[in-house]
């Protein structure tokens, strides 16, 4: 089980396949997603990675958090999240996870905060059918109708679906296909819509319901201390120096 990443939702666009068909995609951007800490079985009772993304102002970071970032030797991060991983998928602290951590064709689960829609009625919030258009109904066409019984039970139960605030909830969309990645610009293009507004934080992880492709990098693609990580492609050997003229 590999680590996920934190990305920022840029927006939607479309890309074209070799057959000329257009595919709607959501563009996600990774901005210096670094490993901040490890969670181990001996110390914490479980195995996980804490990753951070974005750059936070030092004045907005508490003294305790500054100490944690100093131990990890990373700059203060704006957004933190933990991802459960297996012991063989631990990435070194301070390493930066790149966009090619995911490969085209694999499926991912994305988690974000849904767009806020304010106070909504029962028809929009819960897909109620509303009342009739005619036959004595006036003004109340979109009302929810009765909310309780008669003398028994004589009350409206808790958690009854009623009008109220809609949106701003944690939403996970499963099995989105990775269409393309751009490691140089830190972009991940996934097919379809992703919850949340443009500029919102999105957690991206391997799909839990789809089989992981055999060629995905393990423990992942990352840069360690400004150089390529263990799973990255090794650098090409240097060309031999030319001989000087006599």
UniProtKB/Swiss-Prot annotation:
PROSITE patterns with a match to the protein in the record: RIBOSOMAL_L3
Any one annotated GO CC term: cytosolic large ribosomal subunit
Protein name as catalogued: Large ribosomal subunit protein uL3
Keywords: Methylation, Ribonucleoprotein, Ribosomal protein, RNA-binding, rRNA-binding
Chain positions found as N5-methylglutamine: 151
Family: Belongs to the universal ribosomal protein uL3 family.
Post-translational modification: Methylated by PrmB.
Organism ancestry: Bacteria, Pseudomonadati, Pseudomonadota, Alphaproteobacteria, Hyphomicrobiales
Keyword Repeat on entry: no
Source organism: Methylorubrum extorquens (strain PA1) (Methylobacterium extorquens)
Pfam family of the protein (one): Ribosomal_L3
Key word Signal present: no
Function noted in UniProt: One of the primary rRNA binding proteins, it binds directly near the 3'-end of the 23S rRNA, where it nucleates assembly of the 50S subunit.
Highest taxon, organism lineage: Bacteria
């Amino acid at each position: 089980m590999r680590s996920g990443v934190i990305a920022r939702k840029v927006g939607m666009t479309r890309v074209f396949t070799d057959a000329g068909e257009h595919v709607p995609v959501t563009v996600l951007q990774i901005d210096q997603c670094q490993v901040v800490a490890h969670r181990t079985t001996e110390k914490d009772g479980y195995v996980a990675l804490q990753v951070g993304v974005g750059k936070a102002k030092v004045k907005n970071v508490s003294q305790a958090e500054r100490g944690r970032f100093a131990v990890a030797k990373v700059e203060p991060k704006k957004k933190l999240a933990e991802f459960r991983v297996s012991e063989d998928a631990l990435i070194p602290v301070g390493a930066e996870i790149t966009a090619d951590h995911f490969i085209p064709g694999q499926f991912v689960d994305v988690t974000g905060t849904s767009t806020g829609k304010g106070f909504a009625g029962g028809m929009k919030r819960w897909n109620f059918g509303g009342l009739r258009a005619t036959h004595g109904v006036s003004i109340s066409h979109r009302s929810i109708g009765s909310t309780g019984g008669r003398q028994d039970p004589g009350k409206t139960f808790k958690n009854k679906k009623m009008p109220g605030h809609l949106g701003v909830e944690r939403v996970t969309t499963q099995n989105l296909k990775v269409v393309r990645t751009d490691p140089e610009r830190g972009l991940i293009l996934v097919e379809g819509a992703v919850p949340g507004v443009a500029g919102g934080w999105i957690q991206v992880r391997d799909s839990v319901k789809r089989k992981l492709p055999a060629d995905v990098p393990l423990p992942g693609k990352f840069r360690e201390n400004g150089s390529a990580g263990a799973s990255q492609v090794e650098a090409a050997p240097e060309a031999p120096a030319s001989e000087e003229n006599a």
